[in-house]
From Swiss-Prot:
InterPro entries, A to Z: CNL1
Underlying gene: CLN1
Region (Disordered): 1-20
GO biological process terms held by the UniProt record: endosome organization
Any one Gene Ontology cellular component term annotated for this protein: cytoplasm
Keyword line: Coiled coil, Cytoplasm, Transport
Domain of life: Eukaryota
Protein's UniProt name: Biogenesis of lysosome-related organelles complex 1 subunit CNL1
The organism of origin for this protein: Kluyveromyces lactis (strain ATCC 8585 / CBS 2359 / DSM 70799 / NBRC 1267 / NRRL Y-1140 / WM37) (Yeast)
Role according to the record: Component of the biogenesis of lysosome-related organelles complex-1 (BLOC-1), a complex that is involved in endosomal cargo sorting.
Record family assignment: Belongs to the BLOC1S4 family.
Length: 124
């Protein structure tokens, strides 16, 4: 899902400047994280609308009698809703993966800071 992001090809010198200003690709991680949150919100809204639609149709069926085609259609809609729930679960799994990356990054960053401080101390 995050691979759907398409970036324009930039000249090499712009890429070098960008790489120097963000060597750990934090900006890309932030964009991907925001996109993932957007997709989760979008899926939640879609599930909410589908659920409301199914409930309204069920109410109509109860009021006007049960028809086999309608039942089959509702079963199909329920299956679609379950698929959307599965997709949403995948998005949450991706969030968990991002959390793991962030935790790992924090510990690596602490190590870099410690090494840098030692380097600065040796230069004094």
């Amino acid at each position: 899902m995050m691979s759907e992001n398409i970036t324009a090809v930039e000249p090499q010198e712009n890429n070098d400047v960008e790489a120097d200003s963000d060597p750990f690709n934090i900006d890309k991680l932030i964009v991907d994280y925001d996109y993932l949150l957007y997709k989760i919100q979008d899926e939640l809204e879609s599930i909410q609308l589908k659920t409301l639609e199914i409930c309204q149709k069920q109410n109509e069926i109860v009021e006007h009698g049960i028809i086999e085609e309608v039942i089959d259609g509702n079963i199909g809609m329920a299956k679609d809703l379950l698929q959307k729930c599965d997709d949403l679960e995948k998005h949450y799994d991706q969030l968990d993966a991002v959390e793991g990356i962030v935790v790992s990054f924090k510990s690596r960053l602490k190590g870099v800071i410690t090494q840098y401080k030692k380097y600065i101390d040796t230069k004094k």
